[in-house]
Regions:
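Terminal substrate-recognition subdomain of acyl/acetyltransferases
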Residues: 1-12, 121, 131-132, 137-204
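Acetyl-CoA-dependent GNAT
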Residues: 43-91, 100
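A short, internal acetyl-CoA/4′-phosphopantetheine-binding micro-motif in the GNAT/acyltransferase core
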Residues: 69, 96-105, 133
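Basic nucleic-acid-binding interfaces
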Residues: 81, 113, 148
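Conserved acetyl-CoA-binding loop-helix of GNAT-fold acetyltransferases
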Residues: 99, 105-120, 127-129, 139-145
């Protein structure tokens, strides 16, 4: 049984690949996290300045970054899949995720993990790695449910998920989901612009 697929547990959610033009929204999303959430996400209580530096330093050419937007085009959940610079690190990727409090309980973290697994497989990577605080039980539960091996060392834990090779199904699924996310984002943009137009007319 392929435990790297968690799709049966959660509904399909449009997940969009993020690029440099989303940098400001990424920063806004992370700045909305409170102190405890920042601690769990980064492993330390990141300040606003540190978060802004993190967002500015994102390498969209090397890494994969995904987001889930609500109807207002607010980034309510995002994942960062980081790849090392060295050639020997090309087969491995590290996963990090954050979900705003108001959007929790809907399986967004697991869906983002599932999306990251699929893309990593399609890119020929064989291991997805998670480094988390041991108290970050939600993140570690997602990893365990996907079949990852979790090793605890005091206040920190590492999870390793071995990935099977890509298949025609994973490649086609990723292509379809990318297209669906683009269409969904376009609809939300149009709806937002229409609402802004109506509001401006009513305000005149």
């Amino acid at each position: 049984m392929d435990k790297t697929n968690t799709r049966s547990s959660f509904p399909l959610v449009p997940i969009r690949s993020l690029g440099p033009r989303h940098r400001e929204r990424i920063a806004k999303h992370l700045l909305a996290l409170d102190g405890s959430d920042r601690y769990l996400r980064f492993g330390y209580a990141a300040s606003d300045e540190q978060i802004n530096r993190y967002a500015e330093g994102l390498n969209f050419e090397r890494d994969d970054i995904y987001g889930i937007f609500n109807r207002k085009l607010e980034l309510i959940a995002m994942a960062h899949v980081a790849v090392g610079d060295e050639p020997e690190q090309a087969k491995h990727a590290e996963f990090g995720v954050s979900v705003l409090k108001a959007a929790r309980g809907r399986g967004f973290g697991a869906r983002l993990f599932d999306r990251a697994v699929m893309h990593a497989r399609n890119e020929g990577r064989d291991t997805l790695f998670i480094h988390a605080l041991s108290e970050n039980t939600a993140m570690l539960k997602i990893a365990r449910n996907a079949g990852a091996t979790v090793e605890r060392s005091g206040s920190e834990s590492d999870a390793y998920l071995k990935l099977p090779a890509a298949t025609l199904a994973t490649r086609l699924t990723e292509m379809v989901e990318d297209q669906m996310a683009e269409v969904d984002y376009g609809f939300k943009q149009q709806a937002k612009h229409f609402q802004e137009l109506v509001s401006s007319i009513q305000g005149d």
